[in-house]
């Protein structure tokens, strides 16, 4: 039903019923085409058009539609139809271009994902499939690959505030721009910090549409390894704010943006820096209990049903590809998308991922036994969403 009825609007409004399913493409081997084809394998979390959930692969699918309709790559189309007319001369899709520019920001992150204070330098996120010389962008490109500057992004903001017009040329119809900027899918609560200044939450097409101190606010944030961005507009004030930072998963962009907007509006009492700091502290403090709730209650004094060597092998899932389990020196190791982590025995045939830098750190996975008495599958909540539950990875026979 969904395949027969889904529209471009559904893709851009994140209302297909699919949860994020991000883990398979982060450092994954898929091409852009394979990413989109993989949508057919994904388990939905909700019925079609009943629930909002951000879904990056759906945005990639919309980008692929541009390629199918124009005969150009998404990168070629955006460069010719957006970057060049707007004069966005320092915007690119390629990590190589950034690293070749002496005036570029270095990406940073926290020392570990569980530490709130401190920083460490990290590498740029670069897909193995990215090839600037051949004009091939990252597979996930349409969902988040543009690297830019404040000055270039302000040109993009001005273009939006001018309803698709640059100079005397209407690049996108005013009607289309208004469709993108209006509420298309209601949200029951804010994505991040609840605050008294905001009382309406929805999603347009590629934009969050909210109210802020009585004004319609159109905004969108983004995070990718070592960088955070927030673009915000108050259309009735012809006000646009772009906040960029070279720090991973930073909420400072919101505190800074709301403070700037308040000063322009003449509003007082926001105290955004302290409020966001308190919110982030609460988020971090809640993480251990959230992880505990995701895992089964541990049963002490148990042991695996098989020798560790019997668990080793390759396990495959249609959506997520391969998990490789290795037995080394009396320990099991878990490898997914080139990242290897140690497994600790949890209870019976359930093991826990022990790697503070791993996406799945602290999560448990369980091995299933087939009718032949052999280890035959892994059951793992890799979708990171209780609406989907566990995915089954079947052991590949040699």
What does each of the following model-derived ranges do?
Residues 235-269:
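Contiguous hydrophobic, core-forming segments of folded domains
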Residues 1-225, 230:
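Short, surface-exposed loop or secondary-structure junction motifs
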Residues 108, 207-209, 231-233, 324-325, ...:
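A structural signal for short hydrophobic beta-strand segments in well-ordered beta-sheet cores
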Residues 187, 196, 258-398:
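Peripheral terminal and inter-domain segments
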Residues 212, 234-236, 328, 347:
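Structural motif
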Residues 219-220, 230-233, 237-246, 377-380:
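Short, well-ordered beta-strand elements
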Residues 89, 203-205, 216, 227-231, ...:
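Structural beta-strand/beta-sheet cores of well-ordered domains, especially the beta-sheet scaffolds
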Residues 225, 248-250, 359, 383-384:
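A short acidic/small-residue loop/turn micro-motif
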